[in-house]
């Protein structure tokens, strides 16, 4: 029984090292992580202060929750 336990532990270590080498052992770039992560709705982004609601001042479309910057203010949608 002890030999079986040791054999299973050795197999687990070998498999984990093999997986590490096949994967390159590197962390994924942040771009890939952002792409694979859950995207927030416009309301969630606004609630957490990550974007501006309508009629707020903006300089570029990404400032607005609606991604619509008309003139100097965020448009509704």
Swiss-Prot record:
Residues of the signal peptide: 1-19
Comment, domains: The presence of a 'disulfide through disulfide knot' structurally defines this protein as a knottin. The cysteine framework is VI/VII (C-C-CC-C-C).
Similarity-based family: Belongs to the conotoxin O2 superfamily.
Keywords: Cleavage on pair of basic residues, Disulfide bond, Ion channel impairing toxin, Knottin, Secreted, Signal, Toxin
Taxonomy of the source species: Eukaryota, Metazoa, Spiralia, Lophotrochozoa, Mollusca
Main location: secreted
GO (cellular component) term, any one: extracellular region
Function field: Inhibits voltage-gated ion channels.
Source species of the chain: Conus victoriae
Keyword Kinase assigned: no
Tissue: Expressed by the venom duct.
Pfam family, one: Conotoxin
The protein's name in its UniProt record: Conotoxin Vc6.14
Disulfide bond residue pairs: 51-65, 58-69, 64-74
Residue ranges of the propeptide: 20-37
